[in-house]
Amino acid sequence: MTSAQNESQALGDLAAGQLANATKTVPQLSTITPRWLLHLLNWVPVEAGVYRVNRVVNPERVAVKAEAGAGTEAPLPETFVDYETSPREYTLRTISTLLDIHTRVSDLYSSPHDQITQQLRLTIETIKERQECELVNSPEFGLLAQVTPEQTIRTFAGAPTPDDLDALITKVWKMPSFFLTHPQGIAAFGREATYRGVPPVVVSLFGAQFITWRGIPLIPSDKVPVQDGETKFILVRTGEERQGVVGLFQPGLVGEQAPGLSVRFTGINQAAIATYLVTLYTSLAVLTDDALAVLDNVAVDQFHEYK
């Protein structure tokens, strides 16, 4: 019987492919997000891992006087500005892991992509995702944990309407920076605004498109929780000069790869496995209560029938 190879008129794809090199991508990690919150926060370096927020006590008692007119000789008020005696101190928190890489793997399989570089890249991306999650949800320093009851409001009818966002703006009216919510929350607001005939304006930031309300961008983050068909809208004012919300990091780390992030080689064990310590130091401070407000109980599962 004649073999299949003898019947072929030319070299086949399977055999030819043994001499070809495929173009290979770096590993793709589906959990990576843009992490817009990390980009939009102002980051402040701290000393010794501690950031103390000094606030004024009883600001309404600071007395000044405006003269009623020329020729008045009423005595001027006397005043002083008092400070808190036990101000809040924010301590940097650690997000870390030990990355293990077999030396045989890094020696033999690092072309065209270096194995150590890719393992570190994916580990660092995962740590930064956890960082954004902590900045939103940490019970100690997260945005949701630091909002005061006076700065928390509920929706009028469940779904996020323009009226709801207007009410939220009244809580952070001193130069608000951005809304932060889950992508489902942005979609829900877009539906409500469009249904009412006021579709949101779109702006371009960092090469991406965002819808806005009253000129304030709505920033998506999957770290904002969605539970039982409800999420939250967070309105933030950022920056130290504006008495807003700031991110905190430790500068000058050994093995620093990015602000607050270090990678250190810790050694090779008897199994020829190399270990790297990847550490991120981070926290978040709210300088004044009116720098942050939350719209609660935002329904994301309401839809409209357009006719």
Curated annotation (Swiss-Prot):
Protein topology in the membrane: Peripheral membrane protein
Post-translational modification: The N-terminus is blocked.
Keyword ATP-binding: no
SUPFAM superfamilies: Major capsid protein gp5
Compartments (UniProt record): Encapsulin nanocompartment; Cytoplasm, Cytosol; Cell membrane
GO terms under cellular component: cytosol; encapsulin nanocompartment; plasma membrane
InterPro entries: Encap_f2a, SrpI-like
Principal location class: other
Pfam families for this protein: SrpI-like
Keywords of the record: Cell membrane, Cytoplasm, Encapsulin nanocompartment, Membrane
Record's miscellaneous remark: Dominant antigen for this bacteria, could possibly be used in vaccine formulation and/or for diagnosis. Protein expressed in M.smegmatis stimulates a gamma interferon-secreting T-cell proliferative response.
Task performed by this protein: Shell component of a type 2A encapsulin nanocompartment. Forms encapsulin nanocompartments about 24 nm in diameter from 60 monomers. Probably encapsulates at least cysteine desulfurase (CyD, AC O32975) and allows passage of cysteine into its interior, probably involved in sulfur metabolism. Expression in M.smegmatis generates a multimeric protein, whereas expression in E.coli does not.
Subunit comment: Homooligomeric. The encapsulin nanocompartment is formed by 60 subunits; monomers form pentamers which assemble to form shells. There are 12 charged pores where the pentamers meet as well as 3-fold axis channels and dimer channels.
Free-text comment about domains: Has 4 domains; an N-terminal arm not found in the type 1 subfamily, a discontinuous peripheral domain (P), an elongated loop (E) and the discontinuous axial domain (A).
Protein name: Type 2A encapsulin shell protein
Organism of this sequence: Mycobacterium leprae (strain TN)
